[in-house]
Swiss-Prot record:
Subcellular location: Cell outer membrane
Major localisation: membrane
Residues in the signal sequence: 1-21
Keyword 4Fe-4S carried by entry: no
Alphabetic keyword roster: Cell outer membrane, Membrane, Signal
Name under which the protein is recorded: Putative outer membrane protein CPn_1073/CP_0776/CPj1073/CpB1118
Pfam families: DUF2608 (PF11019)
Topology class, membrane: Peripheral membrane protein
Entry GO terms, CC: cell outer membrane
Taxonomic classification: Bacteria, Pseudomonadati, Chlamydiota, Chlamydiia, Chlamydiales
Organism, scientific name: Chlamydia pneumoniae (Chlamydophila pneumoniae)
InterPro entries recorded: DUF2608 (IPR022565)
Record has Membrane as a keyword: yes
Length: 274
């Protein structure tokens, strides 16, 4: 109760200074229901917030650490490509779990409030099917809530932009691709909102990444949109428990069981989408 009183007080102070962004810590995803209303856009970051790989080696942190390791022997571009290929291979193999068991109830509540809801995936567009498959296994369907815009390309791949740099919305999930292309979330939101005739009056963003929430808050301040960043502490604590020594063992065991043909097929898959 005290936590919610603090959140209400923070929001009141925020209303008094409409250009300021608020970031609050939450332990339960149901907290969004306290503030969401019609014309609110509620965003849920998927990777390492909504769902987690059961093995640490499948986390985003492993991808970043693996890239650093590979940079000692490969060029920066080669290291990024190889690390992502290896991480993608793992993402098809590991099991996943839902961080918030009551997320379905939260989505139902947001639907009743007529709030816009958007899942945010940091994966590139050629992993759309894999991401949707993972969410379906938990009966998580973002299309059960009102959509702020239709599915489709936000930035279509052209001769000047690769498939990895493209952004798209599928099943009410925005695929940003930052795990592959480094696209910042504030830039992605700018592209999203530029194509919307009726922008949201407020954005609520649920994530475990405090820095990402701060950058989105700065963008919303410039765009004159109320912003409430919700730092989801159960997911944040899990990210912080990442153990590179443990993942090194997991990666070693996985690599022993994967053939060259497996990674060659993945590489062919990526190139065919490019």
């Amino acid at each position: 109760m005290r936590r919610y009183l603090f959140m209400v007080l923070a929001l009141c102070l925020y209303r008094a200074a409409p250009l300021e962004a608020v970031v609050i810590k939450i332990t339960d995803a149901q907290a969004v229901l306290k503030f969401a209303r019609e014309k609110t856009l509620v965003c849920f970051n998927i990777e390492d917030t909504v769902v987690f790989p059961k093995q640490m080696v499948g986390q985003s942190a492993w991808l970043y650490n693996r890239e650093l390791d590979l940079k000692t022997t490969l060029s920066e571009e080669q290291a990024r490509e190889q690390a992502f290929l290896e991480w993608m291979g793992i993402s098809f193999l590991v099991d996943y779990e839902l961080v918030s068991a009551n997320l379905r109830n939260v989505l139902t509540g947001l639907s009743l409030k007529r709030s816009w809801v958007l899942g945010i995936s940091q994966r590139p567009v050629h992993l759309i099917k894999n991401t949707l498959r993972i969410l379906r296994s938990f009966n998580i369907d973002f299309t059960s809530c009102p959509a702020i815009c239709e599915d489709g390309w936000l930035s279509h791949p052209t001769k000047d932009t690769t498939f990895d740099q493209a952004m798209a919305i599928e099943k009410n999930i925005l695929f940003v691709g930052s795990l592959k292309n480094g696209q910042p979330m504030d830039a992605a939101l700018e592209v999203l909102l530029s194509g919307i005739s009726s922008p949201p009056s407020q954005i609520i963003y649920v994530d475990q990444d405090a820095e990402r929430l701060r950058s989105i808050g700065a963008f919303c301040k410039k765009a004159n949109i109320y912003f409430i960043g919700m730092l989801y502490t159960p997911a944040k604590q899990r990210v912080e428990s990442y153990n590179p020594k443990l993942t090194a063992i997991q990666w070693s065991q996985i690599r022993k069981n994967l053939s060259d043909e497996y990674y060659e097929s993945l590489l062919s898959y990526v190139k065919s989408k490019g």
